[in-house]
Amino acid sequence: MIYFFGDVHGHFDHVLEIVARDRPAAIVLLGDLQAQRPLEAELEFILEMTEIWFIHGNHDTDSDADYDHLFGSALADRNLHGRVAVVDGVRIAGLGGVFRGQVWTPPVDWLYESAKEFTARCGRGNRWRDGLPRKHRSSI
């Protein structure tokens, strides 16, 4: 059995309680995790009880800490974004982040042909860790 939990926004107590009680084969955290510390630390109590997977949400790039606690965690390889994984015998596909209409249907003609071109033209002061601005790390 797979359990899905969405929009926990840093509150994992109910996830820990339900997993400890029901022992599902796997869980998938559906966006807006906003872990207050590395994800493996938040979920330490259940690491040996279940497989843990996640799909990031728009709020998971709100701050450096939100980003690092998820994408820099020991569970970063459990990110389902942009891929299909077999979880407890079921294929699950992930598309995380936020759909930004301005990216897909801008009010003017396209300004950039690629993320690389956008990054080059956005100016060093607008870059995050010498790449895309942090908020666009979750843009679809």
PLM segments and residue spans:
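Active-site-proximal loop/helix segment associated with metal-binding centers of metalloenzymes
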Residues: V90-I140
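Active-site-proximal beta-strand elements of phosphoester/diester hydrolases
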Residues: M1-H9, G89-V98
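Core catalytic region of metal-dependent phosphoesterases/phosphodiesterases
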Residues: F5-V87
